[in-house]
């Protein structure tokens, strides 16, 4: 079940991830095609849509989100786009060059980045450990960029000399996050449980209106 893009809305780890949704496909004037998916949240009655556009001769997918409050009162929400990215011992997470510190959820812990020099997630990195490398993260770990004036987060696989960029306008979407089950026994067990063939993965997320989780907006 791991893989694809999880849209965390209206709260983190969308409760309806595996529920049926409505969809429609549009053919655009420039030859691109857009698949819109849509659902109504059963708890608060708000509506969320995501449009996936593919272009001829382009290697990226463009995703647009649209949210609607169908009720008469303000409703809280968050929105994080959460793609699964395949990883191995040669994978490095790429945060912008102005990211020098990362936070845990709720900013309850902080670490230097990319070279951690203290205790983070109860792991002793005092000797200096590059936590941008998947192979160095032995326990389930989240980290979110403290601040960045750039519009991307990504990953690079040195074994195949290729990578991925997740691009989002930092004025609207300042959130930049990585999460992993970790490269230890616990994480590897989860990788085996979640997929038959695709192996371990990390999550490289971007979030709107906030740089941390589980912050909500209106």
Task: Name each model-derived stretch.
Residues 1, 59, 70-78, 82-216:
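A contiguous, surface-exposed recognition patch within enzymatic or periplasmic domains that forms
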Residues 3-60, 188-208, 212-214:
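Extended, loop-rich substrate-binding clefts of extracytoplasmic carbohydrate-active enzymes
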